[in-house]
Amino acid sequence: MMIWKRDLTLDELNATSQNTLVAHLGIVYTRLGDEVLEAEMPVDIRTHQPFGLLHGGASAALAETLGSMAGYLMTRDGQCVVGTELNATHHRAVSQGKVRGVCQPLHLGRQNQSWEITLFDEQGRRCCTCRLGTAVMG
């Protein structure tokens, strides 16, 4: 059963990214499941750190993008969410290809939410685990 309170398509989700950091980093929403939101991000010159590896800040941006959008999908008209805390643990370096982010709820309260976002490389190996806290406003 879908947990989402807003009924948006992947095309509509991706349209919200135009002219934002999300678009600049090449992040694309790829799956909206019953209790999961997924997106991909390229690992290339836009997301590398100086030594040719995926920048931890880019991983954090993907995680916050997914968690914030998932949080928004859990709100009703007149409400929005804002991030309150982001934690990222980097497990494995990635130098090329894409990473896939998988966002799932840990806690869905009336005033706050917690999301787990796991990033995987193209071989399906976990490369980063994040937790995002959000506050529901409005």
UniProtKB/Swiss-Prot annotation:
The keyword Hydrolase applies. This is Proofreading thioesterase EntH. Its main location: cytoplasm. One of its GO terms (biological process) is enterobactin biosynthetic process. It holds the Pfam family 4HBT. The gene is entH. Homotetramer. Dimer of dimers. Interacts specifically with the aryl carrier protein (ArCP) domain of EntB. InterPro entries: HotDog_dom_sf, PAAI_dom, Thioesterase_EntH, Thioestr_dom.
